[in-house]
Amino acid sequence: MRTRWGWALLVLWAVSLLTALLVYGQRQLSLFDPDGKLLHLSTAPSFDTELVQLLHHQNIKAGSVVHVGTTSRCYCESLTSPHQNQLLASLGEGYQSVRLNIDEVPALQAMLHAVPALIVLDNQNQLRYLGPYATGYGCFTGKNLVEQVVSYATQSPYNGAVINADAQGCFC
């Protein structure tokens, strides 16, 4: 009888733990562009050019990998460091890492609902990618988008930017 109670308590503990993890995980999972604002803006023919000009006014040059975050550096931002390092290593020389606080750029804040976000400008100052670093729970158990971003950044000929607004992951 005693072992049955022991097993019942063990099963109850395991179910409680898994439920707590699931609830916590669901709170960490959010949409990158929940109301479709970025998707709508990106359909304008001048979107790429306007975003590059906005970045130019922030002294961001060609060949930049721009990390868009907040001044408070939320938990989800801390998970992007490995992605940033992998991306810069894969792109090689000619690319520099730049940090941009969304709080300081109201026009960018009006476009992006969630951070961390990634913007890649190639060496010809063309927008190549705008979107998240990764998707999934905590942005480390899901899909790492670094290889795709590298292929977008180095694709020839240039066919326009990839705007990844349809993503779900750890965003603030």
Q: What are these model-predicted stretches?
A:
Residues 53-75, 149:
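Short active-site neighborhood of thiol/selenol oxidoreductases, capturing the structured segment around
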Residues 2-27:
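Hydrophobic membrane-insertion alpha-helices, especially the h-region
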Residues 81-82, 107, 115:
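Membrane-embedded segments
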Residues 134-172:
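Thiol-/selenol-based redox modules, centered on thioredoxin-like
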Residues 74-91:
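Typically the conserved alpha-helix immediately C-terminal to a functionally engaged Cys/Sec
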